[in-house]
């Protein structure tokens, strides 16, 4: 577990109950910065193990991280812990998160972790926990599915934590007039970098930095328009794509005609032409193509418009 500094502990149940009953808990505000003038909040993220089988068991919580901050988003403490689990980890999960089985086998058990989470939230008098996406649902399903043997005390604590959690994806997506965006995309359009670590604490800190940027500085209208265009074109591209592998027994004549059409389609700068071109390419050559990443798309759009958007690390 990682922490910056820790206040003296108080009564967990009493203070979390007090925070839950605050009027501000039930209010939806599109500007968290305003709440921070008088309250402490946390930004939280989780990592969870999902089944690779369609219709398989619910996701299992294996890591939790959060950052607590006050006025002007100033951090006061950080917390991170893995949660003990004996499950076998599939390759994709390990590649994305960097979590290895030994990390979970040596981690504290679920009850210890969640009680420590509650103690930290109570110690800093956190009034609200903000997440982006399904974290609340994952914690809730995990509690019902995998934590049947935990104590009543821990179960009550986790349920109180759940009542403190608010998913702000919908609120801030509406604020930015975006259908939906992940942490990685938001980092890019806010100029906060391009990498997403898939580490619970790092992603919680990224979320805090993104919301701070949106609330205090706002997002570039140019970047938001690119994001909207990217989302729309990506949806059309994958809706039009039909083929994912090379066709067998394609005659030389058809291949030559298709390659000729590919050259012509390369001159047409539309998403429909790109989808058809990529279908023909994979059918004839087996070369699989995908839609550009947001970062690649932004670079291309900036070349068109002559704009230069520098990364925060550029000097």
Please annotate each region the language model reported.
Residues 1-57, 69-77, 102-315:
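DEDD superfamily 3′-5′ metal-dependent exonuclease/proofreading module
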Residues 73-97, 101:
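Short, surface-exposed acidic-centric catalytic microdomains
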Residues 60-62:
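Short coil-to-beta strand junction motifs in C2/discoidin
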Residues 64-68:
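Short beta-strand scaffold segments in enzyme catalytic cores
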């Amino acid at each position: 577990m990682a922490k910056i500094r820790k206040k003296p502990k108080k009564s967990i149940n009493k203070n979390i109950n007090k925070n839950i009953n605050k009027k501000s808990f039930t209010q939806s505000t599109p500007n968290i910065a305003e709440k921070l003038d008088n309250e402490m909040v946390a930004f939280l993220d989780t990592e969870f193990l999902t089944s690779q089988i369609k219709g398989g068991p619910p996701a299992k919580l294996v890591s939790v991280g959060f950052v607590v901050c006050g006025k002007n988003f100033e951090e006061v403490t950080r917390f991170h812990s893995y949660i003990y689990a004996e499950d076998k980890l599939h390759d994709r999960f390990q590649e994305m998160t960097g979590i290895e089985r030994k990390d979970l086998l040596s981690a504290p058990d679920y009850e210890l972790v969640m009680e420590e989470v509650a103690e930290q939230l109570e110690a800093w008098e956190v009034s609200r926990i903000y997440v982006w996406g399904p974290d609340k649902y994952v914690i809730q399903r995990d509690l019902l599915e995998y934590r049947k043997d935990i104590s009543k005390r821990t179960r009550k604590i986790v349920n109180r934590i759940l009542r403190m959690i608010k998913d702000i994806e919908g609120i801030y997506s509406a604020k930015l007039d975006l259908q939906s965006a992940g942490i990685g995309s938001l980092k890019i359009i806010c100029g906060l970098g391009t990498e997403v670590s898939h580490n619970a604490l790092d992603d919680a800190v990224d979320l805090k930095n993104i919301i701070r940027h949106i609330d205090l500085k706002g997002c570039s209208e140019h970047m938001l328009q690119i994001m909207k265009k990217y989302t729309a074109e990506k949806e059309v591209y994958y809706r039009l794509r039909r083929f994912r592998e090379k066709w067998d027994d394609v005659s030389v004549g058809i291949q030559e005609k298709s390659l000729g059409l590919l050259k012509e389609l390369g001159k047409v700068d539309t998403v429909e032409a790109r989808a058809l071109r990529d279908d023909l390419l994979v059918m004839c050559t087996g070369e699989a193509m995908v839609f550009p990443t947001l970062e690649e798309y932004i670079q291309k759009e900036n070349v068109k418009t002559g704009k230069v958007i520098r990364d925060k690390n550029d000097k």
